[in-house]
């Protein structure tokens, strides 16, 4: 293989194949590095984490400006009378999140799990009430646009982009063309960054295995089985049922494509925001309506949190079973609703779904001290829990967007 063909494969070949190669090389590198540590004087696999950090940082950096520009361009050029399907997509997001929480409740009752409540060393500042989460979301909507871009506050970015887009619908065609050209330029930068995904995955896998390994997870096998099993059930059973209800045909080719492209990347980046550019690229490749996906995907990264709802529910019920608290069916359903609301605010809280566990624990009179210990357990299993949660959250964003768009096409055909 000559240099040009090798370069073409590394940066222009099938992305999933290249990511798979990066994954395998990362695992091999992490296994081999300890034997080289004495000769080199440092752990080489840990140093490779820099490659992963650069990749994730690049995606996170470009995501806010990508969303801002694409939404403005899409709405400014929106044809009068055209339909964006946003109402259907938001319904799908909310239904999917609630059903995810219900799935976690059933799984937890089928396989009751107890945990060793270790002392949590991290300094935590969990919100005290559900109203605080909802208030934070409202304040995010009216955030300063520069601050929203700087802090990657996607709710604020969407609010300003939608407002500017509506206003620019009355601008001249020249102005609209400039916005389109700007959006295209940012999209090309995103495409360039995504081409480095295999190198980023290689660095992330090598450093993660070198740092924590899998030994830290062995004490929580059953808890992880319930968590990951619930997420897999939602991904391969619940979501396909919802998609079939919308598109009225075999949903699995679409489900598999979304998991294969979006889910795999999100699993390693562990960031819904960082995966927005990947979802945008996939939506474009699926020929979805740009006016729809340019808004629904960043919105989904904020409110479509089925994986977070599962995490909150499973860990809360694990604490409940550990403490011997009786749980009635109505209370379990209420927990699903609370977990769904909490999950929708997870992106606006530092620490995500884990720091919202005290809200759900408060339903059962569990103190914040004990809830904080549950969060500590969450941090221990986070290497797998957070990755799987993000993969489910992010792949569902593009899946439900595609389902709504395809449903609309079916109605119009």
Swiss-Prot record:
Disulphide bonds in the chain: none
Q: Tell me the compartments it is located in.
A: Cell inner membrane
UniProt keyword list: Amino-acid transport, Cell inner membrane, Cell membrane, Membrane, Symport, Transmembrane, Transmembrane helix, Transport
**Any GO BP annotation:** threonine transport
Q: Name one Pfam family in it.
A: SDF
Q: How does it sit in the membrane?
A: Multi-pass membrane protein
Task: Name the InterPro entries on file.
Answer: Na-dicarboxylate_symporter, Na:dicarbo_symporter_sf, Ser_Thr_transp_SstT
Which Gene3D superfamilies does the entry link to? Sodium:dicarboxylate symporter (1.10.3860.10)
Q: Mind telling me which residue stretches traverse the membrane in this protein?
A: 21-41, 61-81, 89-109, 146-166, 189-209, 224-244, 305-325, 337-357, 363-383
Catalytic function, reaction form = L-serine(in) + Na(+)(in) = L-serine(out) + Na(+)(out); L-threonine(in) + Na(+)(in) = L-threonine(out) + Na(+)(out)
**UniProt KW RNA-binding keyword:** no
Q: Which GO terms describe its molecular function?
A: neutral L-amino acid:sodium symporter activity
Task: Please give an example of a GO cellular component term from this record.
Answer: plasma membrane
The similarity comment for this entry is:
Belongs to the dicarboxylate/amino acid:cation symporter (DAACS) (TC 2.A.23) family.
Q: Which PANTHER family match?
A: PROTON/GLUTAMATE-ASPARTATE SYMPORTER, SERINE_THREONINE TRANSPORTER SSTT
**Task of the protein:** Involved in the import of serine and threonine into the cell, with the concomitant import of sodium (symport system).
Protein name, as recorded:
Serine/threonine transporter SstT
Q: Which organism is it from?
A: Mannheimia succiniciproducens (strain KCTC 0769BP / MBEL55E)
Which classification does the entry list for the species? Bacteria, Pseudomonadati, Pseudomonadota, Gammaproteobacteria, Pasteurellales
Q: Which gene encodes it?
A: sstT
């Amino acid at each position: 293989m000559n240099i040009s063909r090798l370069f073409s494969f590394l940066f222009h070949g099938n992305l999933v194949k290249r990511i798979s190669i990066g994954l395998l090389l990362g695992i091999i590198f992490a296994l081999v590095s300890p034997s080289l540590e004495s000769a080199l004087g440092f752990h080489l696999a840990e140093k490779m984490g820099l490659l992963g950090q650069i990749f994730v940082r690049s995606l996170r950096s470009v995501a806010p400006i990508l969303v801002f520009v694409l939404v403005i361009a899409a709405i400014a050029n929106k044809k009068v009378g055209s339909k964006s399907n946003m109402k259907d997509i938001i319904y799908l997001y909310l239904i999917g999140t609630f059903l995810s929480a219900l799935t976690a409740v059933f799984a937890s009752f089928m396989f009751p799990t107890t945990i060793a409540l270790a002392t949590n060393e991290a300094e935590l500042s969990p919100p005290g009430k559900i109203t605080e989460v909802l208030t934070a979301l409202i304040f995010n909507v009216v955030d300063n646009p520069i601050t929203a871009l700087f802090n990657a506050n996607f709710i604020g970015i969407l609010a300003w982009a939608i407002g500017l887009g509506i206003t620019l619908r009355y601008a001249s065609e020249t102005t609209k063309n400039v916005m389109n050209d700007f959006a295209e330029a940012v999209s090309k930068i995103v495409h360039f960054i995504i081409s480095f995904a295999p190198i980023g995955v290689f660095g992330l896998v090598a450093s993660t295995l070198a740092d924590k390994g899998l030994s830290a997870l062995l004490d929580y096998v059953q808890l992880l089985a319930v968590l990951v099993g619930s997420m897999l059930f939602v991904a391969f059973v619940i979501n396909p049922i919802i998609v079939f209800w919308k598109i009225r045909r075999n949903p699995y080719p679409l489900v598999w494509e979304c998991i294969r492209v979006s889910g795999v990347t999100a699993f390693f980046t562990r960031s819904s925001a960082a995966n927005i550019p990947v979802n945008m690229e996939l939506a474009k490749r699926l020929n979805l309506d740009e006016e729809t996906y340019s808004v629904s995907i960043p919105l989904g990264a904020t409110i479509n949190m089925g994986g977070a709802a599962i995490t909150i529910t499973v860990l809360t019920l694990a604490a409940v079973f550990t403490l011997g608290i009786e749980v009635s069916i109505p209370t379990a359903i209420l927990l699903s609703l609370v977990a769904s609301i909490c999950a929708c605010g997870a992106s606006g809280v530092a620490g995500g779904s884990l720091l919202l566990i005290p809200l759900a624990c408060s339903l059962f009179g569990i103190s914040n001290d004990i809830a904080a210990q549950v969060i500590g357990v969450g941090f221990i299993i986070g290497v797998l829990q957070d990755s799987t949660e993000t993969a489910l959250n992010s792949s569902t964003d593009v899946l439900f967007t595609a389902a709504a768009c395809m449903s609309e096409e079916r109605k119009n055909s």
